[in-house]
């Protein structure tokens, strides 16, 4: 025979202060876990949604990053343009974009220091190959001019990043003529400028990377293999989504520190839950004995107290999730461990994050509640009745 759930709810309501304090402890732990998971989900979304399965990114052989690459020759780009399986635009131009990557230093808003920002130099074809990126204010840079467009995140997070301001690159100042939105992809952390003008300023005849659009998935794989095998090219080809997925190692420090903090807080929350349940057992000794006398078994009492602990943990989970809701979608940034420039992304409280938070809270409820529940189910009836 099972003890009614209403019995547990009534007892939690009778001890309001202790219930609230314990639920708040669990809530803060859950909120911390949600924050860390939302950060990682946001970072994963920024990199995971970047790229097209038909795009193949070519780097110099031995490189795993555009910034560290360099050395892709113009001759290699011309060879790539004439390979079978390369898509063309409506003008009949091969969708092959040689690109250069530099890092510039910008001051954060509020005087909170400076940080590195990735600056990508490309041609109009490179823009055409990224349909998720579009201008929301001003215009794109003019080919052959020292002009740049900045992402909306850069515009919000940094000083001197408005239309009309200038960014110092190489031999001169590059006016900002537009603001673009990159639909939450990794390009949301970038500044874009004209490739040919950069080559003139720096007298560069090589590219950091080359982006190639294939006509179909089979051609994309063939182009990737051709780049890796052709000794003339000396390139390392990879599908664009795979490249950006590999960049999620930027979240490793967040995951490590967050896991340690969440674990320490979880231990504290488990002790708080155990303390609450032990207090309930001590306070309700005669009740427990009476339940045994009228026919409730030890497993029923164990189950009842475990349910009470789980209800308490679910209450804490709900409070913790509610505490984090105002931060959902908040823009933040971290350092890319590959390029050492800032990656801008938004906190994402996805359904998976919320479900994980609830499971985390339930685990705390089980760990914190089992020992008191076991103690309650094993109490001697006569000694409990004597009080």
Region locations from a protein language model:
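Hydrophobic alpha-helical transmembrane segments of multi-pass inner-membrane transport and secretion
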Residues: 16-43, 251-287, 310-319, 363-367
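Short beta-strand boundary microenvironments
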Residues: 115-157
């Amino acid at each position: 025979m099972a003890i009614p759930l209403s019995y547990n709810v009534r007892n939690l309501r009778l001890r309001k202060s202790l219930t609230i304090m314990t639920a708040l402890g669990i809530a803060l732990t859950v909120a911390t876990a949600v924050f860390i998971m939302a950060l990682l989900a946001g970072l994963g979304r920024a990199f995971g949604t970047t790229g097209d399965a038909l795009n193949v990114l070519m780097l110099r052989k031995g490189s795993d990053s555009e910034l560290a690459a360099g050395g892709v020759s113009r001759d290699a780009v011309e060879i790539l343009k004439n390979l079978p399986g390369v898509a063309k635009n409506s003008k009949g131009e091969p969708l092959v974009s040689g690109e250069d990557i530099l890092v510039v230093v910008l001051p954060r808003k509020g005087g909170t220091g400076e940080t590195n920002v990735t600056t990508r130099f490309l041609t109009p074809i490179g823009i055409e190959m990224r349909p998720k990126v579009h201008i929301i204010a001003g215009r794109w840079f003019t080919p052959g001019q020292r002009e740049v467009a900045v992402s909306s995140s850069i515009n919000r997070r940094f000083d001197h990043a408005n239309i009309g301001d200038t960014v110092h690159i190489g031999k001169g100042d590059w006016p900002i003529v537009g603001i673009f939105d990159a639909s939450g992809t990794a390009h949301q952390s970038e500044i874009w400028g004209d490739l040919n003008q950069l080559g003139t300023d720096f007298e560069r005849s090589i590219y950091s990377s080359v982006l190639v659009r294939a006509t179909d998935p089979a051609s994309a794989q063939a182009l990737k293999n051709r780049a890796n095998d052709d000794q003339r090219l000396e390139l390392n080809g990879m599908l664009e989504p795979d490249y950006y997925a590999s960049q999620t190692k930027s979240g490793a420090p967040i995951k490590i520190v967050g896991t340690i903090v969440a674990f320490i807080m979880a231990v504290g929350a488990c002790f708080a839950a155990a303390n609450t349940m032990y207090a309930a057992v001590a306070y309700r000794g005669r009740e427990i004995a009476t339940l045994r006398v009228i026919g409730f078994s030890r497993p029923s009492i164990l189950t009842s107290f475990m349910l009470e602990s789980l209800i308490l943990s679910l209450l804490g989970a709900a409070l913790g999730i509610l505490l984090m809701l105002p931060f959902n979608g908040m823009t933040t940034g971290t350092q890319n461990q590959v390029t050492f420039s800032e990656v801008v992304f938004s906190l994402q409280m996805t359904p998976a994050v919320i479900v994980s938070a609830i499971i985390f809270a339930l685990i705390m409820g089980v760990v914190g509640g089992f020992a008191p529940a076991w103690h309650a189910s094993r109490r001697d009836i006569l000694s409990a009745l004597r009080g």
